[in-house]
């Protein structure tokens, strides 16, 4: 049985840990709100660009050709795997890694290229023998548009050089702080819907072709940026949930240790009283 001194040390240690997990929960909660706000602010912009592109892709643009719209036989795929830089986020990192490995399962290493965003997917995939062509890190919980642009530029270069035939982004979609879903989204080639109903007509300056040439890469960048924001919110939501659980568990452990400590003290006091009474009786 542990001594009273040992129990006091354990209670102090668990209390210190609880303070740390509580602080981490509060930080994750504040950052989660900011990430959600950014994602919500980005959505209308992305939706509007998508709407214009869908309208234009169904228009008669004589002579317009773009490799970004060119569907070709898929022999090699570029995977952009988005994950976390840090741990202590529950099953967030393991879930996205598991999903990514499922996408690569059974495929020869010469049929895919991998770009990672986040230290966790980079290190985990390297440890499993996956060659990483390019890695980005240091911004998983606070991505910027420039990060998305750099990632998309790397993938686009591979695609335009015909080193890959499609680009797929693997990231975690944020539902709420308790639910995050790993998923894959094809970025290239850009899909052209066949049944889009024509709506409002647009006037383009200087021309529809030049506007489309400018919008296509922007659309890809904003799509990657949205994926980074979704992943950031998912990471922070998972971390907040994990730290909430850790804080609650620490509280329960402190209560249990406190009860054990009080019982030990009560037993010690009872023994001391018994010894005093026994000594007094012996002197009579």
Please place each PLM-identified region on the residue numbering.
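C-terminal beta-strand-loop-alpha-helix "lid" module of Rossmann-like NAD(P)-dependent dehydrogenases
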Residues: 1-284
């Amino acid at each position: 049985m542990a001594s009273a001194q040992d129990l006091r040390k354990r209670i102090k240690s668990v209390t210190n840990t609880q303070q740390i997990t509580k602080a981490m929960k509060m930080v994750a909660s504040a950052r989660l709100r900011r990430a959600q706000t950014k994602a919500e602010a980005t959505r209308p912009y992305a939706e509007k660009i998508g709407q214009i592109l869908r309208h234009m892709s169904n228009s008669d643009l004589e002579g317009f050709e773009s490799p970004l719209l060119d569907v070709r036989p898929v022999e090699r795929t570029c995977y952009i795997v988005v994950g976390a830089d840090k741990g202590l986020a529950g099953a967030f990192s393991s879930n996205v890694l598991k999903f990514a490995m499922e996408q690569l399962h059974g495929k020869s290493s010469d049929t895919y290229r991998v770009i990672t965003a986040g230290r966790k997917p980079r290190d985990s995939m390297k440890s499993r023998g996956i060659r990483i062509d390019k890695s980005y890190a240091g911004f998983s919980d606070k991505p910027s548009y420039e990060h998305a642009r750099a990632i998309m530029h790397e993938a686009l270069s591979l695609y335009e050089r015909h080193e890959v035939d499609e680009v797929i982004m693997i990231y975690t979609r944020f539902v709420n702080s308790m639910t995050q879903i790993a998923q894959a989204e094809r970025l290239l080639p850009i899909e052209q819907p066949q049944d889009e109903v024509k709506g409002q007509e647009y006037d383009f300056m200087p021309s529809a072709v030049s506007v489309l040439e400018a919008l296509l890469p922007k659309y890809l960048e904003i799509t990657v940026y949205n994926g980074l924001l979704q992943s950031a919110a998912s990471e922070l939501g998972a971390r907040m949930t994990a730290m909430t659980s850790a804080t609650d568990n620490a509280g329960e452990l402190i209560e249990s240790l406190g009860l054990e400590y009080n019982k030990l003290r009560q037993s010690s006091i009872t023994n001391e009283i018994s010894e005093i009474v026994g000594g007094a009786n012996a002197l009579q």
